[in-house]
């Protein structure tokens, strides 16, 4: 009879909780709480629709810089992560009053900067003390922090907006402070990191072309997710005229799906392999986004919210798993994942700025979703190219 693996020791559980909290604050709240806030910002007259969309793009631009800078903080995660979380909380408090547009751009950029750095350092810091047999489950729990932020903001923000827009910003900031303080001592001790293995990994064997193509796929995936991440609530609230409450309701569905997405896609990969699971997931995204081009009824909104919501955090374990299949060296795996995170950030930032310009000129949400479906079609094509290249590489080894 197979024995159930023992529960993680308290120190491991605290580290997992701390990393989950970091992604909850740095990504779940810092990025996704803005989605239900966006139509309220427009309705309150703080900014116009085009300016409000640019604020979402500013966050993604900061995320790119944070992902690049985050590698330098990995050796100091136990000290850097809580400070980054507090800085994230400060960005909400700074936006609690109708101040000039440049002020909001600055703080939304900072919130992206801290979130990108937390995405790079949080999970590795916690997972290095988790037993190998439990890292899959632990990773799923950590990335669930993103989904919890999406779902939590979808429930909390509409309630706070009944008090006032400024109160909503300030309360989300206070929540981020509370979560940071509660998990501060959960981070595991830092360890010194040597540059020797990294230098050897980057200057030794040639870099596989299949890995490069896969990293590009991850960037295209990021671009395809932006229409839902930034514009879904605004599409329902203003585009369909259903109101902020309805838009936030679908955002809760989106977030609830995001909390379980990594585990679902991970289980699928365990059954059919990461290669096939990634192809299936990309195909699902094409249909789930494309359905909005032909229908905006409840069933279409449910399908798109559930499927795309699950894939926002669920894409990470699939791409990471494929990279681990390509690279058996842990150092090269880490380098590849770092590069993938940076390219993902580039895809998000570039897509966000492009779509903000498009939306400012057209005001048509369906153009944005058409872009998303097209991006996933391109990602699927490139993924199949990467699979063929990798198969040939393995055959010649």
Predicted feature descriptions by range:
Residues 107-145:
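Cytoplasmic helix-loop-helix junction between adjacent transmembrane helices
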Residues 66-78, 261-273, 359-360:
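Helix-to-loop junctions at the C-terminal end of transmembrane segments
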Residues 35, 211-255, 262:
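Extracytoplasmic gate region of multi-pass secondary transporters
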Residues 132, 137-188:
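Helix-loop-helix hairpin linking two adjacent transmembrane segments in secondary transporters
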Residues 87-99, 284-296:
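C-terminal ends and interior cores of transmembrane alpha-helices
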Residues 330-362:
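A late C-terminal transmembrane helix in Major Facilitator Superfamily
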Residues 117-130, 314-328:
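Intracellular juxtamembrane helix-capping segments at the cytosolic ends
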Residues 102-111, 299-307:
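Paired small-residue
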